[in-house]
Amino acid sequence: LPVTNNMNKGDTKVMKCIVEVISDTLSKPNPLPISEECLETLRGDERIISILRHQNLLKELQEIAVQGANERTQQQRRTEDQELESLAAIEAELESVAHSLQAL
């Protein structure tokens, strides 16, 4: 794996661990567990930690968006149900008035 000279030793370790994880994941039906050395390297790298935090934040925002959409759908259904009940009450009142007028 060629590495440029302007990368420090820590960057090189992180890159090698990322390559190890990706290649194990993509090349085997049952991926091998990540080596302890790579696990520690990746856990200690602030860039990886930042990416994971960002990923968790995006997941949380997506969950909030889905929850909001579900709440709006439920509110819309409640509003539609209330409108249908109001229309049914008006219709019943109109029928009552029509019967009263027919009796005259």
Curated annotation (Swiss-Prot):
Annotated disulfide bonds: 17-38
GO annotations of cellular component type: chromaffin granule; extracellular space; secretory granule; transport vesicle
Subcellular location, record wording: Cytoplasmic vesicle, Secretory vesicle; Secreted
Key words of the record: Cytoplasmic vesicle, Disulfide bond, Secreted
PROSITE patterns, sorted: GRANINS_1, GRANINS_2
GO biological process: adenylate cyclase-activating adrenergic receptor signaling pathway involved in cardiac muscle relaxation; defense response to bacterium; negative regulation of catecholamine secretion; negative regulation of insulin secretion
Subunit-level organization: Dimer.
Annotated function: Chromogranin A probably has a paracrine role in the regulation of secretion or maturation.
Name of protein: Chromogranin-A
Organism placement in taxonomy: Eukaryota, Metazoa, Chordata, Craniata, Vertebrata
Gene symbol of the encoding locus: CHGA
